Amino acid sequence: MEKLGINWGLLIAQLINVIFVVWLLTTFLYRPILNMLNQRTSRIQEGLQDAEKVKEQLANAKRDYDAELAKARQEAAAILAQAQERARAQAAEIIAQAHRDAEKIKSDALAQAEQERLRMLGELKDRMAELVVLTAERVLGEELKTNHDRLIEESLAELGKYN
């Protein structure tokens, strides 16, 4: 190979140098860079997984929040409906009580009017009896006896039938 201009000693030295440089580059440059790239890829994958977990947790939290909000709205609507029903019942009770009070006042007034009417009728009967006695005394000229009291009472009873 010397005819071709190849120097075996130099070729072997260069081959050893190339192998040594490849070994040096592989050991000190390629593997650390490859390890660094692998670590970075791992961190990126972990970050993506963490982001996905956070996204799922956020979706779950939103779903829970929406469920709680819907439940709270239903409870609020139920409480409002109960309050409205109680208010209607109280209003009906107040109106019924007012009607009962009005009826009692009316019946008391009617009873009082009836008592007043009876009292006035009694006074009228007494006054009429006095007038009858006075008229009879003047007509007869003397005071009526007790046996005539019965006649007066009967006359008044007859007058009471017409009232």
Swiss-Prot record:
Keywords: ATP synthesis, Cell membrane, CF(0), Hydrogen ion transport, Ion transport, Membrane, Transmembrane, Transmembrane helix, Transport. InterPro entries: ATP_synth_B-like_membr_sf, ATP_synth_b/b'su_bac/chlpt, ATP_synth_F0_bsu_bac, ATP_synthase_B_chain. It is found in: Cell membrane. GO terms for molecular function: proton-transporting ATP synthase activity, rotational mechanism; proton-transporting ATPase activity, rotational mechanism. Its main location: membrane. Signal peptide: none annotated. GO terms for cellular component: plasma membrane; proton-transporting ATP synthase complex. The chain crosses the membrane at residues 9-29. It is a single-pass membrane protein. NCBIfam families: ATP_synt_b, PRK14473.1. F-type ATPases have 2 components, F(1) - the catalytic core - and F(0) - the membrane proton channel. F(1) has five subunits: alpha(3), beta(3), gamma(1), delta(1), epsilon(1). F(0) has four main subunits: a(1), b(2) and c(10-14). The alpha and beta chains form an alternating ring which encloses part of the gamma chain. F(1) is attached to F(0) by a central stalk formed by the gamma and epsilon chains, while a peripheral stalk is formed by the delta and b chains. Belongs to the ATPase B chain family. F(1)F(0) ATP synthase produces ATP from ADP in the presence of a proton or sodium gradient. F-type ATPases consist of two structural domains, F(1) containing the extramembraneous catalytic core and F(0) containing the membrane proton channel, linked together by a central stalk and a peripheral stalk. During catalysis, ATP synthesis in the catalytic domain of F(1) is coupled via a rotary mechanism of the central stalk subunits to proton translocation. Component of the F(0) channel, it forms part of the peripheral stalk, linking F(1) to F(0). This is ATP synthase subunit b. It comes from Roseiflexus sp. (strain RS-1).
